[in-house]
Amino acid sequence: IEVAVLSSAMLLAGCEQVAILALNQVETTSFTVEGATLFMEGEINSKTLKQFEAVIAQNPGITTLVELEVPGSLDDDTMIPLAYRVRELGLTTHLTSTSRIYSGGVDLFLAGVNRTMENGAEIGVHSWSDGSREAKNYPRDALEHEQNRKYVEDMLGDDAFYWFTIYAAPADDIHIMSQDEINTYGLLTK
């Protein structure tokens, strides 16, 4: 029975990896422009940065990125350069009263030079996992933390929010942040 359970778990993990690879082959993010505002919805994947750059090239007057429903990122190797590009462009990030952002969507929100949200918006965070270990299971000075830790530090001025997220909920769950937590970690500039 133990072998069957282990085999099933490995197969399921393999299926998850295949699903992620498949989702990285199609556009999972949509962008809509209204004046100087760019509305974004969907999962961030390997196609998102290229989509974003195309929209910006056609609409150089964009000043604000509004995240609507952004459940996360399938590809941190895309999300982090996308976020640095948002910061480089000096964009404001904004959440409407119906915005729901989680995981990598929250990381992208941090890129705004100004970060604002309306009452009712939802911000959800959790740990990352490399498939075998959760972030909190690595020593604090482990190299595995560095890319995400440094990114948060670059965006917020310190890495306290990074450490909060990896303990807030395991990778397969989500913690919806309270207004006090949002304020404590400086997610909003206004």
Task: Name every feature range the model reports, one short phrase each.
Residues E16-A19:
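Bacterial signal peptide processing site
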Residues L12-G14:
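C-terminal motif of bacterial Sec signal peptides marking the signal peptidase cleavage site
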Residues L49-I56, M79-A83, R87, V106, ...:
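Extracytoplasmic/secreted envelope proteins and their assembly/folding machinery
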Residues G61-T78, T92-R100:
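Short, glycine-/small-residue-enriched flexible loop/hinge segments at domain edges that mediate gating
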Residues L21, E41-T63:
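A short, well-ordered alpha-helical element
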Residues R87-S129:
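Glycine-rich beta-to-alpha active-site loop
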Residues T64, S132-K190:
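Charged, glycine-interspersed solvent-exposed loop segments at helix/strand-loop junctions
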Residues I1-A4:
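Bacterial N-terminal signal peptides that target proteins for export
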